Each structure stands twice: as structure tokens, then as C-alpha cells.
Amino acid sequence: MEDKEGLDAAALAGRILLQNGAEIFRVEETIERIAKSYGMEGNSSFVLSSGIFITEEKDDKHFYANVKHIPLSTAHLDKVAAVNQLSREIETGKYTPAEAIEVLHNIQNMPEKSKTAQIIASGVGSACFGYLFGGSIFDSFAAFFVGSLLWVFLGIMSKRKKRTTKIMLNIGGGLFLTTLSILVYRLGIGDNLNHIIIGSIIPLVPGVAFTNAIRDIANEDYISGIVRLVDALLIAFCVALGVGIIMTVYHRIAV
């Protein structure tokens, strides 16, 4: 029974890591650490970007297995850090398997940052990158406004009763931010439309996903790396498509 609980704890830790943006090698390493800490020396794990497969060979007649399907999702690095810290504490013998599972459930249910904090962070990130790429103070102010409203728009779209696909959400985000950037620019708030758009687009850029894809490929986890890379490139394409549609229409009308 304790072996099964230990395997469940390792699987749950791996699931939380994979769901929240951890690299494949980190997931496998954490699973192995936790399993061995609970005396499961015969454990073997196989991790993909969308699934975890763990087995434990107790003896010739007894095997334990745990399979988890993990859909692609957004990153929550606080949860990744919490699981990493927990795995270190498990190695020191601080938790029994049952206690570790309870802590992992608490980590899994860890609340996100408040909506207000997320909106402000989106605006500040947009403003900073707008300025970093050569925009003026007024461009940064405009990017802050657009970036903040973009996050509100994304929150509304993602909470609709009818589920919005990732493709449509990112195309819609590109359409929204570009339309709002043009409106703000035409009202005379910013100096350069391109810099406003560049700053405002930052909340949609899949930076963590792209970085993890490259790291997975560098660590020879080719299947997971390619899947994550395709996902990141698809997001980038959808955002660019949304921006491009509005800019094309705007320039045709302006001319």
C-alpha cells in the first residue's frame, strides 16, 4: 500500500510540474527522486508533453503502474517552485507518502495571482517592452493601457460558456490589441503606432513555451520538444495573423 502511495505521490508531482511549464528532464528527475526516496529503486518513468507513464517493479510477481494524461496548458511557475522544494524535503525524510500527497494537492489548488495583479502586470510588461524597443514615454503609456485591456479581453473570452480554442483566442487577441492600438494612436496618445503594437503584443508572446521547447530538444527529448515548439509557433502565427489583418485593413483605409 505504501509503495502505491509513493508511486501516486511521484506521479502527482510530475503531473503538477508538467501542467505548469516544467521541462521534461525536470519532471523525470523529480519523479525518480521521490520514488527512490520511498524505497522504489525499480521505478521507470517515460514523460511526454501530454502524458506521464510510471512503473515500479517490486518483484517478479508484483508491478505497479501509473498513467496520467496531461493536456497542454499555461505556465504557473510558483507551483513548479513549490514542487521542487517539496521533492527536496521528501528526500530528507520529512514527509510520508500520504503527507506528501496532501501537500501536493494543496500545491495543485494554489490560487493564481489576483485578476487586478495580472492586469497590472500585463500593462507594465507591455509598457516596458514598448519603451525597450525604442518607443517614447507616450508610446509606453499607450502600450500600458492597451496591454491592460488586452488581459481583460482574454479573461472574458476564456470564461465564455462556449469554450474558445487557443487558435481563436490568440487570433482574437491580435485583432483586439491592434484595433485598440490604432484607436489610441489616432486619439494622439502615442507617437508611434508600431511601438505601441510591439509593446502591447508581449502578453501574447509564448516565451516560456518556446524556451522550454528548445531546452527539451537540447536535452534530446525530441518528441516533447517538437510538440511544444509547434504549439509555440502556432500561437505566434495566430497572433501575427490577427495583427496583420487589422494592419492591412487600416493601411488600405488610411491610403
PLM region spans:
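Core alpha-helical transmembrane segments of integral membrane proteins
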Residues: 112-187
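Generic detector of multi-pass transmembrane helix bundles and their immediately adjacent loops
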Residues: 185-255
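Interfacial loop-to-helix junctions that mark the boundaries of transmembrane helices
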Residues: 68-71, 133-139, 192-196, 254-255
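C-terminal ends of transmembrane helices
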Residues: 106-107, 150-163, 211-224
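Alpha-helical transmembrane segments and immediately membrane-proximal extracytoplasmic
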Residues: 63-76, 109, 113, 117-118, ...
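Helix-loop-helix junctions within the multi-pass membrane cores of secondary transporters/permeases
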Residues: 95-105, 111-121
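Soluble N-terminal domains of membrane-associated systems
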Residues: 1-95
